[in-house]
């Protein structure tokens, strides 16, 4: 499969990170040395399901990204409900980051100097669905670039046991550390539909009743 072309840093690293962080805390609380006490760690991940999940996310998101890029065609996608571009969107976004706040502290709250630093160009590698790209970007350039990427999370849980069989935290863990499975806020979405359907059936509606 070509699904993981843009994800040489395996997507499942997001799950490894979650497990590692949990075990570090567990080992500290239970007086174990995680790296020298010979512990064997087993998870409920099904390697076949994990590979299918990774390929599904990679294939689907790369396809949707192309549609997204074609639709916006070089225009900024951050718009308000009236369709107008949100003013100072990138500036306000960077201001909420710990990186910006640390720079501001280091530079005596001089925001002009901080933004001068944020706009300095330097060599860096960036993610693309065709593989890593070497480029020359400023921090603000990279923020603009990455804000144009669609994101996703994927988790498969066995209902009877609660075992996690597949976990994909994002499209590429090396470049996007945010884990959409663990850190993302949940919306009810389709999860609520069975409750609505059950209420309708209880009130005599058939599954084929037109609404």
Regions found by a protein language model. Give the residues of each.
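Extended, non-catalytic substrate-recognition/exosite surfaces adjacent to catalytic cores, especially
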Residues: 1, 7-211
């Amino acid at each position: 499969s070509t699904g993981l072309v843009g994800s040489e840093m395996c997507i499942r690293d997001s799950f490894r990170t979650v497990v590692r962080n949990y075990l570090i805390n567990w080992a500290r609380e239970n007086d174990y040395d995680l790296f020298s006490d010979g512990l064997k760690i087993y998870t409920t991940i099904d390697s076949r399901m994990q590979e299918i999940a990774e390929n599904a996310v990679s294939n689907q998101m790369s396809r949707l990204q192309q549609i997204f890029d074609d639709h916006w065609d070089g225009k900024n996608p951050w718009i308000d409900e009236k369709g107008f571009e949100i003013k100072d969107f990138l500036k306000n976004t960077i201001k909420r980051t710990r990186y910006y706040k640390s720079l501001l502290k280091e530079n005596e709250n001089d925001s002009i100097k901080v933004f001068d630093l944020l706009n300095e160009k330097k060599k860096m590698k960036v993610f693309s669905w065709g593989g890593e790209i070497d480029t020359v970007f400023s921090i603000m350039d990279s923020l603009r670039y990455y804000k144009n990427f669609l994101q996703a999370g994927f988790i498969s849980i066995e209902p009877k046991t609660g075992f996690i069989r597949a976990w994909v935290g994002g499209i590429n863990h090396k470049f996007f550390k945010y884990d959409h499975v663990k850190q993302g806020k949940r919306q009810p979405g389709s999860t609520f539909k069975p409750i609505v359907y059950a209420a309708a059936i209880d009130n005599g509606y058939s599954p084929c009743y037109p609404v």
